[in-house]
Amino acid sequence: MQTPKLVILLALAMSAAMVNLSQAQNSPQDYVSPHNAARAAVGVGAVSWSTKLQAFAQNYANQRINDCKLQHSGGPYGENIFWGSAGADWKASDAVNSWVSEKKDYDYGSNTCAAGKVCGHYTQVVWRASTSIGCARVVCNNNRGVFITCNYEPRGNIVGQKPY
């Protein structure tokens, strides 16, 4: 009787460790650190975590859980959204790195993106006036993938202004 109990306890402990590992890769610091690395690279000050923005992001992510659509919330904050296909364990760093990868398509001198390219996610990440972020992640229902959103305050990407 002791052996089955031990096996069950070990299985439960391993499951808890795997859940904690997944949560650890999507903690506030897992969003803040890559944002701040990108910001430091262009001489912009750090952002800090906002539980208010996190709550807004989580509420919106929960609304996307059934369809996983890349659709903006239309809320009062700056916003970046990310979708990752089913079958992969998309993490905070995957989303932020995706947005930061647009740097190569941004020309600071002209404050424009390369022809046919997108760079607004990157400019929001490094927007000097944005000082707070809050993010959320959901695994969408029916094998639709992962939806990640980050919100920024004050919002960035003001037309006619450079990010830094």
From Swiss-Prot:
Organism, by scientific name, is Hordeum vulgare (Barley)
Function in brief: Probably involved in the defense reaction of plants against pathogens.
Asked if the keyword Magnesium belongs to this entry, the reply reads no
Gene Ontology cellular component list: extracellular region
Q: Which cysteines are joined by disulfide bonds?
A: C68-C140, C113-C119, C135-C150
Q: Which family does it belong to?
A: Belongs to the CRISP family.
**SMART domains hit by this protein:** SCP
Residue positions, PTM Pyrrolidone carboxylic acid: Q25
Where does the UniProt annotation place the signal sequence?
Answer: 1-24
Recorded protein name is Pathogenesis-related protein PRB1-3
- Tell me where on the tree of life, at the top rank, the source sits: Eukaryota
GO biological process, alphabetically ordered: defense response
Q: Which SUPFAM superfamilies match?
A: PR-1-like (SSF55797)
Keywords noted in UniProt:
Disulfide bond, Pathogenesis-related protein, Plant defense, Pyrrolidone carboxylic acid, Signal
Start and end residues of each SCP domain? 34-152
Q: Where are the transmembrane segments?
A: none
Q: Which Pfam families did the record assign?
A: CAP (PF00188)
